């Protein structure tokens, strides 16, 4: 885990891509932590990988949830279509995380947080 946080602190595209390689781990807990750290980094370089994790129905729900939240934390509105699509996911943990991410994106853009209707 030290390596994960060390890479986070570098905040470079290279560090971001190195973290994304960690999604090949068998550990769902590690994959969850990587998604969390990528959200903290707020680096759009991670978005393609985070979108893949969210959209992969075989991925652990904990990882999909954290990928959605990280996508919102990054603040790039290009992820709105994926988040909208998965806000209707049958798993409430995933669907609700997508709604939270969409609300965060709306808030960052200056919209009213309470009235956002996705």
What are these regions (language model features)?
Residues 1-11:
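Alpha-helical segment of the N-proximal tetratricopeptide repeat
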Residues 6, 37, 70-73, 101-104, ...:
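Core register positions within helices of long alpha-helical scaffolds
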Residues 29-44:
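Helix-adjacent hinge/juxtasegments
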Residues 26-27, 58-60, 90-91:
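Short inter-helical turns and helix N-cap capping residues of alpha-solenoid HEAT/ARM repeat scaffolds
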Residues 12-24, 43-55, 76-88, 109-118:
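Amphipathic alpha-helical scaffolding segments comprising HEAT/armadillo-like alpha-solenoid repeats
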Residues 78-104:
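Preference for long, well-ordered alpha-helical segments
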